[in-house]
Amino acid sequence: MSLFSTPGGFGTGGGSMFGSTATDNHNPMKDIEVTSPPDDSISCLSFSPPTLPGNFLIAGSWANDVRCWEVQDNGQTIPKAQQMHTGPVLDVCWSDDGSKVFTASCDKTAKMWDLNSNQSIQIAQHDAPIKTVHWVKAPNYSCIMTGSWDKSLKFWDTRSPNPLLTLQLPERCYCADVVYPMAVVATAERGLIVYQLENQPSEFRRIDSPLKHQHRCVAIFKDKQNKPTGFALGSIEGRVAIHYINPPNPAKDNFTFKCHRSNGTNTTAPQDIYAVNGIAFHPVHGTLATVGSDGRFSFWDKDARTKLKTSEQLDQPISACSFNHNGNIFAYSSSYDWSKGHEFYNPQKKNYIFLRNAAEELKPRNKK
């Protein structure tokens, strides 16, 4: 019996196998292309939690839709289902049991998509587009956290039309992450707030941004005991900050590094500097991936402060990325991200989602 009630949600045809070949520069890494990708820019990707057998991938797009694929062991992708918003979808997440997907949109709503019944219902409302949505699973409660451009962070019981709690933000929410019992929200004007989620969500600390330019993406990382201990923050200026919440030596432990830059290295030959569009931590090794407007992905070891790999350059930006639950698959999307304005938008250009075998490339290198 299929997990979903609809065996063929959208599109036709099957995906290619691992080790497929590419003929042009839209796929220079020769990674697997996901079948029937969205028809407009892909804003977010999320793999299913380990509670589900197999691997399922969710993508949200500026075509107002959310799509789900089953990813088989051989790399083939099977379209399973699709839901719509009335505005672009900006974020997606899963419930911890894998039965529901939550979607956030420019239509100012968040929805809960029951994958077994393929029904979607509204569960959140803001006064402006909702930029982030996260599932919070605590010992004594579970809820949805939404961050909006209306400068608020709201927590919702999916059975109630009113929020459990509303927290005011200093500015518009640009990106967020949750790893219980910690949440981090980055806002416009370089605002940065850490929340604790035990018992009831509350503000823990406001942090002076380690970055000098607009925040673009954030991801929480864990320590060796599997507890959230800090976060990586990416900006539009081709830079990532690694920030620990309570480091033994803040001046030494917290640092930033440059990435997603090209060409020159000094004032006589200026660099091209690109936005960091996404950050994802490997669930096993704790290493991280960054993707950027330069059309490349890079893998990093933050503890050794080394780069593990940089991809060849795709012919358009990489807009989002995600690891599956055991870190064997790295998904990344190739879409225009509007970083160069409307004059660089080519409506004829296709959007792609690629799958890469990430089992080996994200391993920390052995210290000499």
From Swiss-Prot:
Q: Where is the composition biased (Gly residues)?
A: 8-17
The membrane spanning regions, by residue number, are none
Task: Name the GO terms of the biological process aspect.
Answer: cell division; regulation of mitotic spindle organization
Has the keyword Nucleus been applied to this entry? yes
Which cellular components does GO assign to this protein? cytoplasm; mitotic spindle pole; nucleus
Alphabetical keyword list: Cell cycle, Cell division, Cytoplasm, Cytoskeleton, Mitosis, Nucleus, Repeat, Transport, WD repeat
Q: Where is it localised?
A: Cytoplasm; Nucleus; Cytoplasm, Cytoskeleton, Spindle pole
Domain of life of the native organism: Eukaryota
Q: Which SUPFAM superfamilies match?
A: WD40 repeat-like (SSF50978)
Swiss-Prot/TrEMBL WD repeat ranges: 37-79, 84-114, 125-157, 168-206, 215-255, 271-301, 310-346
Its main localization is cytoplasm
Q: Name one Pfam family in it.
A: WD40
Q: Which InterPro entries match?
A: G-protein_beta_WD-40_rep, WD40/YVTN_repeat-like_dom_sf, WD40_repeat_CS, WD40_repeat_dom_sf, WD40_rpt
Annotated stretches, region: Disordered: 1-37
Q: What does this protein do?
A: Plays a role in mitotic bipolar spindle formation. Binds mRNA. May function in nucleocytoplasmic transport and in directly or indirectly attaching cytoplasmic mRNPs to the cytoskeleton.
By sequence similarity, the record places it as follows: Belongs to the WD repeat rae1 family.
Any idea what this protein is called?
mRNA export factor
The UniProt gene name for this protein comes to rae1
